[in-house]
Amino acid sequence: MIAAVHGPAIGGGLGLALAADFRVTCAEARFSANFNRLGIHPGFGLSYMLPRLVGQQQASLLFYTGRRIAGEEAVRIGLADQLVPQPEVRSKAIELAEEIAASSPVAVQSTRSTLRAGLVEQFRLAVARESIEQNIHFETEDFQEGVRAMSERRMPRFKGY
């Protein structure tokens, strides 16, 4: 699966993009794991997928700060695979799919299975943990403040509970 990211991939949208095998993007795209800015634990399997792609240090930085990064930085840190002009994102993603399709389907499928061995189980464990943590966070004042602050387009004033 190939994701063509030409706009925002934020929160759950980032999780969807990371579920793909490859990501084609542009300078105008924005990526953010902004959960902590909302006062909540990351979800959508991001606590497993993001460190797997960019490393523990970069993932921690993106989670803790909620920082938005552009397409260039996403490619630089390994979050995306190709940087192309915005009007070409979709066509370049299709070109990549066609390039992969020129290989043996049996070989591609078995290689993908080998590369992803154990991924499903680890992903399920991460999602289960995320769900437990999020259910706790939904009840906090910090989560309510984070959502309120985002809707009011202001910095949140978290209390730590």
Residues covered by each model-derived region:
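C-terminal long alpha-helix characteristic of the crotonase
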Residues: V24-A29, G71, A80-A128, N135-E141, ...
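Hydrophobic alpha-helical segments typical of transmembrane helices
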Residues: L46-M49, Q58, A70, S110, ...
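Short alpha-helical scaffolding segments that buttress acidic/His motifs in well-ordered protein cores
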Residues: L62-F63, T111-T114, M150
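Anionic, Ser/Thr-rich low-complexity intrinsically disordered regions
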Residues: Q144-A149, F158
